[in-house]
Amino acid sequence: MKIQEVKRILTRWQPSSFTLYREVFTQYGGSINMHPDIVDYFMKRHNWHFKFFHYKEDDKIKGAYFICNDQNIGILTRRTFPLSSDEILIPMAPDLRCFLPDRTNRLSALHQPQIRNAIWKLTRKKQNCLVKEAFSSKFEKTRRNEYQRFLKKGGSVKSVADCSSDELTHIFIELFRSRFGNTSSCYPADNLANFFSQLHHLLFGHILYIEGIPCAFDIVLKSESQMNVYFDVSNGAIKNECRPLSPGSILMWLNINRARHYCQERQKKLLFSIGILKPEWEYKRMWSTPYFTGKSIC
């Protein structure tokens, strides 16, 4: 018996199945890189290998997770597919207190009361940004004024749900090139198109246009459960010539507001991640609170 198998036995995590994992996720939710539809996509379309585990307490399954390709908890492929790897939120019951037998240094701060063998501040540097529960009236007024100015300059808004997968792929690649030029590589076009096509139902948010031409698009993915809805901005791109109109700020505000309304209508908790905090991304502090990600010690 391997050491890792012994660790799982000692910490009460049992071998499980994809079917059971989906059920647990549907109940408790998790980050988009743990979503069963994403898992299913990589199992069927890319022949990736997954091992599933669940935690049972008082004859009730309280949590589940998987190991991808015998390496990681979560699907970590941010350079080739539009999936964030900034944090991992494992589907767990709110009252679960357990030891996690596998290593990761990307645990969501929301797991701090749940996972006993993790550190959250000592030697930790990486912080993930979760959108604030509310903004000040001054902040909201500034965003509304930006939006009205944008509309008066010929701006318009379209839902990603109304765009085809090919259209979304073309828009994102063009805007990405405009934003980064040759300084950063975009996702392979075939990967992006196939991902959008197969997982279109997980896409959320808007695209901004100026005089009918796309000027801003954030890839926002939605992970919904019975308890909460987790939104994740995996990447974004804007048209450089439109920067004076603040399209990035307007788009963020519109997407967050739409996410809030979506959750309010369904009476579910909102979780909205805008990724890691870096010195060049200090603007994220306007929108969010940074939290250290946790590292499991095992």
Q: Model-derived features: where do they sit?
A:
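Short, composition-biased local secondary-structure segments
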Residues: 27-28, 112-122, 249-254
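Aromatic (often tryptophan-rich) hydrophobic motifs at membrane interfaces
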Residues: 202-298
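A conserved beta-strand-loop-helix scaffold within acyl/acetyltransferase catalytic domains
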Residues: 2-59, 66-72, 116-120, 133-243
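Non-catalytic accessory segments adjacent to catalytic cores
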Residues: 83-125
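Short catalytic/ligand-binding loop motif for oxyanion handling, primarily in non-cytosolic enzymes
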Residues: 62-63, 72-76, 281-283
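Short, solvent-exposed cationic patches
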Residues: 76-100, 235-247
